[in-house]
């Protein structure tokens, strides 16, 4: 009987800890992107786009890293809305592309995305306390030209003329 109680207690502990591990590893793409006037910065280069990305999380440092990943995700799959005199930026690919090339994008968003993005206001981020944690906003600059080139070279993004053949 004692062995049975010990076994049941051990199994409950195992299930509880397994759920905690799985929850920590899952990171969803919960973010907002807004296009803002650049002010004094030079943003006339068509190869780059500068915008604000807001992500949600529990720790500020972790959420900052998530902001960078979400910014690249936003450019690739959602695009940017127009704001003021700045026009909208269309997404590089459709939202179904992520599920079609799931393995590629899971690997890409582990670290490869970092070479296409930089913070324009390092250390100067917006942090808002919310009911479920923190909302962290960072102004970022994404190199769209290099990102498109990488996706084309890897066979993920197709040229219009390739699609017509």
Residue ranges and their predicted role:
Residues 1-24:
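Bacterial Sec-dependent N-terminal signal peptides
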Residues 18-165:
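Domain-level marker for long, solvent-exposed, non-transmembrane regions
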């Amino acid at each position: 009987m004692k062995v049975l109680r010990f076994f049941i207690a051990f199994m409950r502990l195992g299930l509880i800890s397994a759920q905690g591990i799985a929850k920590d590893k899952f990171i969803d793409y919960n973010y907002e992107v807004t296009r803002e006037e650049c002010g004094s910065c030079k943003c006339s280069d068509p190869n780059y786009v500068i915008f604000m990305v807001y992500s949600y999380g529990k720790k500020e440092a972790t959420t900052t890293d998530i902001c960078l990943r979400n910014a690249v995700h936003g450019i690739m799959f959602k695009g940017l809305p127009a704001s003021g005199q700045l026009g909208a930026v269309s997404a590089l690919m459709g939202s179904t592309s992520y599920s079609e090339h799931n393995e590629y994008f899971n690997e890409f968003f582990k670290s490869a995305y970092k070479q296409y993005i930089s913070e324009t206001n390092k250390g100067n981020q917006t942090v808002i306390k919310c009911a479920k944690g923190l909302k962290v906003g960072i102004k970022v600059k994404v190199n769209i030209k290099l990102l498109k080139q990488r996706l084309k070279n890897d066979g993920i993004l197709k040229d219009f003329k390739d699609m017509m053949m």
